């Protein structure tokens, strides 16, 4: 297994990113300005995009694991990689996600705690309702992990 940074032609990996953020125009907002990593284990199993949010905060804008490989530790491996790589540069690793029973427990298992929320984020910023695990996503829930 190896994790590598992608500096060029990031759009070649868009299909996996769209699993975590299904509106391409929203992905486009952070894809080029962010730093992208792919986790390969023979082929691409997972990927993420992070951005510098200032004040010592590194934000995971998108993290996605190939559906056939979910639950095998690839997502956690990416988060642990980010925490280790950026521990000297940042004090906080942050992620924003929908209030979903599929994602919140994953981040909590990875050491994140709830920080704050942006009410109506998904209804205000997406052109169609977003559902995850049968639940419509409305608010953006932010979780943070100290580095």
Residue ranges and their predicted role:
Residues 69, 73-81:
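Conserved acetyl-CoA pyrophosphate-binding loop and the N-cap/start of the following alpha-helix
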Residues 4-67, 79:
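Acetyl-CoA-dependent GNAT
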Residues 34-36, 137-142:
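Short hydrophobic/aromatic beta-strand or adjacent loop that forms the aromatic wall/cage
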Residues 65, 79, 100-103, 120-126:
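Short glycine/proline-centered loop/turn elements that form peptide/ligand docking sites
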Residues 1-9, 141, 147:
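Conserved N-terminal entry element of GNAT/NAT acetyltransferase domains
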């Amino acid at each position: 297994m190896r994790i590598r940074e992608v500096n060029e032609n990031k759009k070649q990996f868009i299909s996996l990113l769209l699993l975590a953020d299904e509106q391409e125009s929203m992905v486009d907002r952070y894809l080029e300005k962010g730093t992208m990593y792919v986790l390969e284990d023979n082929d691409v199993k997972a990927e993420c995009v992070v951005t510098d949010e200032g004040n010592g905060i590194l934000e995971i804008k998108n993290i996605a694991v190939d559906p056939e490989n979910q639950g095998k530790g690839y997502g956690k491996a990416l988060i642990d990689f980010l925490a280790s790589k950026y521990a000297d540069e940042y004090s906080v690793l942050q992620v924003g996600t929908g209030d979903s029973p599929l994602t919140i427990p994953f981040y909590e298992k990875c050491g994140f705690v709830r920080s704050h929320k942006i009410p109506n984020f998904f209804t205000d910023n997406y052109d169609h309702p977003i559902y995850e695990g049968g639940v419509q996503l409305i608010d953006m829930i932010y979780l943070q992990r100290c580095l």
